[in-house]
C-alpha cells in the first residue's frame, strides 16, 4: 500500500472499506493478507498504524500470513497481530533460488516458540514459497513439525535419512545431521544461486539475481557428497540427493576457479588464465552431465509439461514461451 496519507484513522478506514466491499459480495468472506507489507516499509507501518489497519476489520474476518518467519517474525512485533488470526509461514525460496539454503535449527526453535507463545489466534503453519525443487527437506520438516510436535529434531532428521535412502543407514543419518547443522544454516534470499547462473564477470556476482552466498566451507559439502556416494540405495530420492548436492558442490567450486582466473588476469599470466578457463568449462560440462542423471533437473521435462497445457500448436508454443521465461 502506498497510502495517500499515513495517519491511523485513514489506514483504518481503508482496511474497513476493503473488507466491506468483500462482505457485500460474500457475507462469509475472509480476507487473506500477507504481513510482508509491514516488514517491507517499517518507516510508515508503525505499531500504531498496523494496529489501526488490523483492528478496523471485524475479528476473525482477516487472516494474516506471517510471510517470512525464518528471517523476520511479524507476530512478535505486533502483539500477535493485535488479536487477528494468523499463520506462521516459512518462505524458503523467492523464485530464482537454486542454492541449498534454509536455517534448519533456527526454524525449529521459532516453530517451538510460536506453538507455545503464539496465542490462541495462531491458526496454523503455512508455506509461502515462490519457488520449489532444490530444498525439499526444509518444507518436509516445516509441515511435519506442524503435526509431530513431540518428535525431536534429530529424530526427524534420522527418519528423513531413512526415507530418502529406503533403509536405516548410519552414514546417511550422520551426513544429514551434518547437513542440517553445517549447510542448512542461512535462510534463502532473493537471487540465491551459484556463479554458473551469472553472466561472465571478473569480480563480484554480476547482478542481485546471482548471489552465491553460503554459510559453510566448500570442503564441508564436498566431503558430505563423498560420504553420500558410499551409501547403497536404489531410491529415486537418494539419486535426487546425489545430483542435488553434487550440483551445489560443482557450483561452489566455480566461484573459486573464477577468482583464480581473475588473479591470473591481473598478473597478466596467460597460461594460468587458459588453465583456469579450461577448468571452468570442465565444471560446466560436468554440471550438465550430472543434472542429466535425474529428470527433476531436465529442461525437456519442464517444457513438455508446459506444452501439455496447450490444445493446439499455437497455445503449446505460448505455454512453452512462458515456461522458458520463468527460468
Could you describe each region identified by the protein language model?
Residues 99, 130, 228-235, 247:
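Membrane-targeting and insertion segments and their boundary/processing signals
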Residues 221-222:
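Mature extracytoplasmic or organellar-lumen-exposed domains after removal of signal/transit peptides
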Amino acid at each position: 500500500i502506498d497510502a495517500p496519507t499515513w495517519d491511523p484513522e485513514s489506514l483504518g478506514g481503508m482496511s474497513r472499506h476493503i473488507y466491506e466491499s468483500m462482505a457485500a459480495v460474500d457475507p462469509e468472506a475472509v480476507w487473506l493478507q500477507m504481513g510482508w507489507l509491514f516488514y517491507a516499509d517499517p518507516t510508515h507501518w508503525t505499531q500504531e498504524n498496523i494496529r489501526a489497519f488490523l483492528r478496523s476489520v471485524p475479528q476473525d474476518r482477516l487472516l494474516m500470513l506471517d510471510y517470512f518467519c525464518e528471517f523476520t517474525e511479524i507476530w512478535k512485533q505486533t502483539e500477535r497481530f493485535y488479536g487477528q488470526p494468523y499463520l506462521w509461514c516459512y518462505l524458503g525460496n523467492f523464485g530464482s533460488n537454486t542454492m541449498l539454503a534454509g536455517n534448519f535449527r533456527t526454524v525449529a526453535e521459532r516453530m517451538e516458540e510460536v506453538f507455545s507463545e503464539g496465542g490462541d489466534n495462531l491458526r496454523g503453519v503455512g508455506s509461502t514459497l515462490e519457488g520449489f525443487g532444490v530444498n525439499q527437506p526444509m518444507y518436509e520438516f516445516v509441515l511435519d513439525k506442524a503435526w509431530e510436535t513431540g518428535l525431536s529434531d534429530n529424530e526427524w532428521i534420522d527418519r528423513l535419512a531413512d526415507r530418502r535412502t529406503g533403509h536405516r543407514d548410519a552414514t546417511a543419518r550422520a551426513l544429514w545431521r551434518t547437513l542440517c547443522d553445517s549447510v542448512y544454516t542461512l535462510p534463502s534470499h532473493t537471487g540465491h544461486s551459484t556463479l554458473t547462473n551469472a553472466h561472465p564477470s571478473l569480480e563480484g556476482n554480476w547482478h542481485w539475481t546471482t548471489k552465491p552466498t553460503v554459510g559453510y566451507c566448500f570442503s564441508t559439502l564436498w566431503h558430505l557428497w563423498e560420504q553420500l556416494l558410499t551409501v547403497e540405495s536404489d531410491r529415486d530420492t537418494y539419486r535426487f540427493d546425489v545430483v542435488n548436492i553434487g550440483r551445489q558442490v560443482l557450483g561452489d567450486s566455480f566461484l573459486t576457479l573464477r577468482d583464480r582466473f581473475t588473479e591470473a588476469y591481473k598478473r597478466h599470466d596467460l597460461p594460468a588464465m587458459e588453465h583456469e578457463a579450461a577448468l571452468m568449462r570442465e565444471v560446466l560440462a560436468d554440471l550438465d552431465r550430472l543434472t542429466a542423471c535425474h529428470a527433476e533437473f531436465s529442461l525437456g521435462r519442464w517444457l513438455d509439461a508446459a506444452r501439455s497445457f496447450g490444445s493446439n500448436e499455437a497455445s503449446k508454443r505460448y505455454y512453452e514461451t512462458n515456461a522458458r521465461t520463468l527460468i
